[in-house]
Structures are given as C-alpha cells and as structure tokens.
Amino acid sequence: MKMTSRKLADLLKQRLQHENRSFFFDREKDTLRVEDQTTKKGITLELPPIIAKWETKKEEAIDEIVYYVSEAMEAMEGSGQEMSGKEAGIYPVIRSTSFPDQTSDGIPLVYDDHTAETRIYYALDLGKTYRLIDSRMLEKENWTKERIRETASFNLRSLPSVVKQDTVADNYFYFFRANDGYDASRILNDSILHEYKQAAEGELAISVPHQDVLILADIRNESGYDILGQMSMSFFASGTVPITALSFLYNEGRLEPVFIMAKSRPKKD
C-alpha cells in the first residue's frame, strides 16, 4: 500500500480519536493539527517526514507518533503543571533554531541561544512527557529566567548517562542514549565534553541529530568525518524531534558548527 498524506491523516485521526479533540488536515501544507476543543491548544504534525519513516518502519512509525501526540495532548489537557515544588523536574532541552519561539497561544517560550544551529529551551518533566516552560509560567510563579537556567543545569548534571561505543575505520563513536528525553541535552554538560576531549586522540566532534541521542566522535582520520556525517543524517531523518544534521567541533570549551564535506575535512560555517 502506498501511503499518502490523506491516508496518513485519516489513520492518525482514527488512532488519536477523543471526544474533546478536533482534527484539521491541511492538504496544501501537508499537515494535520490535533487540537483540544476547550483550550484550543494542540499539535501540528508535518506529514511527509512521518510518511518517510513509515516507508521503513511501517506500523512502528505510526505507534511512535501516536504515543508522542497522546502524551503531549494529555499534558496540555491536564492541570497541576506548577513549577514550585517540582524543581527537580526542570531540565534543558535542545531544539533547532527553526523551532517555534512561542506557544500556539502566542505566549513566548523561555529559551537561550546556544549555537548557530541550536537553542536551549526549558521543560517541566511530567513523567511520560514534558511541557516547555513559557513566560506566563514564570510570571505566575514569580520565577526569573536565571533561576530556571540554574535549576535546569543542576538537574541535567545529576542525570546518569547510558553510553554505547562503536569503532568504525579506526574512529571512535560514543552514543548517549538513556532514552529519558534529555540525551541531546547532555551536550550542555561541560564535564562530559571536557572528559571526552581530554581522552580523545584525534579531534572531538559532536552531533545532536535528534532529542534522543548525543553522538561524540573521536575523529582520528579523514574518513571519520564522512562516517559521522552519514550517521548524523540517518539519525536526523529517523528522529521524532529532529534537531540538526550538522556537527560541531569542540575546542577550548566552545562548539563550532561545521559542514562535513564528503572525502574531506570539515569546513567551518
């Protein structure tokens, strides 16, 4: 069966059906919006990337999206999302610079600039999902942005890491995949980056293709850049929340975006 945007939209409507939800399919933009009828809050899904995943993962791709949307909608529809008393559940999350800087209601989200490709947003963990923190939440509870930043940074450092190592063509790759929703966020943990930089025999390159993986690479020869580029593109295409397919070099505590050119060393952006 060939999957089309219309077929996918109908399938998702069926799987996500709820008495208090509305669905809006935009044929021109190839999107499906799932919206709470009471609050008018919701999620807009871009269908082409989901179709691309369906081509290789079939029902598993649909299951992932249904789970992601269901948890996010329940978080929006629920209550009790105050930050006070839940400080231990505040974490930073990495997003691309093209990610919206405000909610669907037009309320500014709290974020900091990170690199030319990425931003740091802040989230309140709700168990199976999380809510991005916006300016209204800060005002309501009289929190400052600095307090959010410091709290999130402290909590991130307390998270355990799950790392898998792979060696390809004498280059070493380390995959951080704890599947806790904050794997990419570990790029903000300077102690981790410093540790791997000190141990690296070559250049330390870093990739955050989507929110559920951080790749550190000890690049020891020219082919290492090509391999990292291929890995990053593959993860970027398969992630539920893609960030960037570009990589970074880590030098003197700074991240420098680079374009990895085939058969050559990277060129700085």
Swiss-Prot record:
Which InterPro entries does the annotation name? Answer: DUF1444
**One Pfam entry name:** DUF1444
The positions making up the signal sequence are none
Family per similarity comment: Belongs to the UPF0354 family.
- The name on file for this protein is UPF0354 protein RBAM_026940
Say which species the protein is native to.
Bacillus velezensis (strain DSM 23117 / BGSC 10A6 / LMG 26770 / FZB42)
